[in-house]
């Protein structure tokens, strides 16, 4: 279809429901691995990547329940298989985000290498370099990356290049490390800020988020909080998430109202 012809003349008004941002939801789902109890996440978009992430968590042993109020309950306190299998990782690069939380909480992770490529040609070298500096032992073969750590240590790490998922992975891992971790040249995207805000609502101590340098003071555990995912913005949407129509009127003003669920102002212990 080359064009749309719109014949006006009627006043436009109404409400639309805006779903949460996929790129904010994916790391928050991964971060639920860090919690000691159930996480309650709302306003998740109905997209394949979100479904795949939930399938990945479920395959590792997380218990997932869908509530009538739209919230998804995820309990990852007793993961029995800290592994991201190929059939799930190959469809979504963000599956790599379970690596940091798994090593921090369970001391090990087995992550499939999409396409069977070598470790030093993968675009996750910043993740691995940071985790190795924290004390993780890393090995690999043609199919998997293996990480083990009896104890992770705080680090001062400078990303050679800005990495959104790298920032998220190391930030999540650092939340449970005793001491202060400093990450430099961090990504500043809204989804990074949203992840830090969620973790802080669960008891983490993350400062400087949204700036180049982030400081994380480790805590012994994280507790659940009800959380609605950040609204999707035009700048952060992936193709296919929304169709944007630009309407130009010369005689009247067009008002659009965005409707979403209210986010609690204070943490709610569950």
Residue ranges and their predicted role:
Residues 1-232:
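Structural preference for solvent-exposed beta-strand-turn elements
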